Amino acid sequence: MKKGMLILFTVTLTISFVQFSCKKSISDRTADLAALNSAGNLDLNAGAWKTVLLARPDTFVVATPAATNSTGYIADLNEIKGYQHNLTSQQKDIIKYWAAGGVLRWNEIMRTLVAKYNLPPYQNADGTYPIPSSANPFAYPLFPFSNPPYAARAYGYISAAQYDALIACWFYKTKYNRAAPYKVDSSVQANGVVRSDLPAYPSEAAVMAGVSAEMMKMLFPDEIAYIQQRAQEQELATI
């Protein structure tokens, strides 16, 4: 009896493992997370942290921002206010979604892509399996086959790139010390973010969107349009 129960348990566990490990989709349990609150821990010295990939945080030059009384900056403020004045309910939901944190959301996007591509291609007539080719990623079988080794490397590449990009971002934030638009003009709303004294330029959301999207485009070349759409979504949510 005990042996039979053990066999039944083992078979059930195996079936469950196969079923969930090969799913193309994942459930989202974080849609209603509150906005990330880092006002009390700005890590203003983060620009001096040791990088992983970059030799220095200023390896890539970020141009000096325009003065807050310049015509271009005032035009940008007016554009922000115009955008904020006509927000739809869908846009407000997107703002709330990204307010939970770019690192979290891009990790979830990555999980979605890994799950989608975590299925081996269908076998050929002779019983052999075709191999995805990075040289021709748009032909069947689609590249990549995101098996555990590929997925682990992909997560590592993106995490390291995000880390270095944010260190560089913080380096220039403290260098230029540009106040956030809502501090320059009180009529600008701080939608989806907790007000703080963190310098606003360059935008950490724009940096996060840029580095995450470009890395994912290389790792999942058949998803370029989807990845670019998510990057633009994060950038607009910050406005």
Predicted feature descriptions by range:
Residues 1-29:
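Bacterial Sec-dependent N-terminal signal peptides
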